[in-house]
C-alpha cells in the first residue's frame, strides 16, 4: 500500500536547522582555536572579528528558530537549576572578548555580591547572546551588564551607549514584535520575539518572566531588561 502522506515541512526545516547549528558550532570552535594561535596584532584585525561576529549571529538565529519550533510544538521543556550570576556573566563576556576588542568596545559587569538564581541556563544564555550581539552592533563604545534583585524578580540588564531603540519598537508588545518585520532594513526582531516567548516560560506562582526594552539607563542608550521570577 502506498503512503501518500505529505511530509511535515516544518519538521524537515527544524532537522536542517539542527544540523546547521551543530556544524556552525564546530566552525565557531575552530575559529576560536585559530584565533588563540594568532599573534596579538592579528587578533584585533577587523576581518577576524567580522568572521566571529557574523558566525555568532547566524548561530544565534539558528538557536532561536529551533527554540521557537520546539515551543510551538510543545517540545521545549525547562531545565531549572541554581546558578551564580557572576560566573554566568563572566563566561558569556569572555566569549565576546575578541569581537569587542576589535571594535574598541569596553564591556563591564556589575553583579550583586554572591547573587544566585534558579533558571534554565541554556535558554537565558541564548537570550543574553542575542542581546549582546545587538548591543555590539549599535553601541558606540561601551556596554554594561548588570544583575540584581528587583522585588521578587532577578533583573539582568544590558546597557549600551548607542542611539537607543526606535520608538516604534518600544511601543510594540514584545509578543507582537514580529508584526514589524522589515527585510529591507534587516530588522526582523526575531531575537526580541524569541526572548519574550522563552522568558515567560519561567514561572513562580502567579509571576512570569518577561523582557522590557527602554532607552536611557546607565549609559544613555538602549536597555534590554530580563525579569525572571
Where are these regions (language model features)?
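Conserved C-terminal segment of the DHp
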Residues: 26-41
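Conserved micro-motifs of the catalytic ATP-binding
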Residues: 73-78, 116-119
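Glycine-rich ATP-binding loops of the HATPase_c
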Residues: 200-217
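Short alpha-helical segment of the dimerization/phosphotransfer core of two-component systems
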Residues: 53-61
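Short beta-strand/loop element within the Bergerat-fold HATPase_c
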Residues: 142-152
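Glycine-rich/acidic phosphate-handling loop/turn and adjacent ATP-lid/helix
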Residues: 159-186
Amino acid at each position: 500500500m502506498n503512503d501518500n502522506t505529505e511530509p511535515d515541512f516544518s519538521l524537515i526545516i527544524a532537522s536542517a536547522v539542527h544540523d546547521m547549528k551543530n556544524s556552525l558550532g564546530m566552525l565557531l570552535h575552530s575559529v576560536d582555536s585559530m584565533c588563540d594561535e594568532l599573534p596579538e596584532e592579528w587578533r584585533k584585525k577587523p576581518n577576524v572579528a567580522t568572521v566571529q561576529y557574523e558566525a555568532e549571529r547566524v548561530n544565534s538565529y539558528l538557536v532561536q528558530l529551533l527554540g521557537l519550533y520546539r515551543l510551538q510544538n510543545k517540545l521545549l521543556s525547562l531545565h531549572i537549576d541554581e546558578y551564580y550570576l557572576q560566573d554566568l556573566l563572566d563566561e558569556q563576556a569572555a566569549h565576546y572578548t575578541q569581537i569587542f576588542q576589535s571594535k574598541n568596545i569596553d564591556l563591564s559587569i556589575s553583579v550583586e555580591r554572591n547573587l544566585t538564581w534558579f533558571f534554565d541556563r541554556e535558554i537565558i544564555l541564548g537570550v543574553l547572546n542575542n542581546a549582546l550581539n545587538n548591543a555590539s552592533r549599535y553601541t558606540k563604545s561601551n556596554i554594561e551588564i548588570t544583575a540584581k534583585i528587583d522585588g521578587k524578580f532577578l533583573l539582568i540588564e544590558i546597557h549600551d551607549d548607542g542611539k537607543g531603540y526606535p520608538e516604534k519598537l518600544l511601543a510594540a508588545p514584545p509578543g507582537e514584535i514580529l508584526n514589524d518585520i522589515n527585510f529591507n532594513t534587516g530588522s526582523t526582531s526575531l531575537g526580541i520575539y524569541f526572548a519574550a516567548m522563552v522568558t515567560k516560560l519561567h514561572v513562580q506562582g502567579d509571576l512570569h518572566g518577561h523582557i522590557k526594552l527602554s532607552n536611557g539607563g546607565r549609559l544613555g542608550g538602549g536597555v534590554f531588561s530580563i525579569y525572571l521570577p
